């Protein structure tokens, strides 16, 4: 974005330089529901000439083991004329087994997604790829570019407190249980404050459907409060990204990374 090298961006943005370019109309942008982007690529509404995909390794069978995100990689590789795979040696090989790759059938032949619980696994731990499309495999050793989260301020803590009071009211009304609470979490400092509040709550065996795994969710898993979380990627501070790399084999039992069409499906 800073080099003025991006013509079009979709379906999401959070980078200040990119936001500035979009607002100045020097970069085209479409704000698309995150579960729709893969479908639009799948249905040939968006062409993909070259897909650049990050992986932790490529198996002997030619399958791709994704790294800390799945996103729309399945659809991008299926649609692309050419594929470049970046094997990032900074990412832990122990991430293998954390992914659950299930490809949504094309319209008009869609079927119900066979997931009823956050911990359900319905696919494979790898992405199948046409080897004829691969034009390059590049080795790198680069950390994810993630900024640390700001400490929870007074407003964030009040919002988190109000939310936890609401949950307590739902338990008192008989609509919710302290055991097995299934939640959906957003992105940012306020959701992280809610996670911190849940650490000191009466809730146990928490399960989550979310878009990204953040620091607060890792703390809940460490505490034993959260048993499983379903997402499409990590959005961790540098400290927690390092922690994930060091302990990926443990977190693999509690985290499932899925294609974005699945993780963000309404």
Predicted regions and their residues:
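Conserved alpha/beta enzyme-core scaffold
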Residues: 1-266
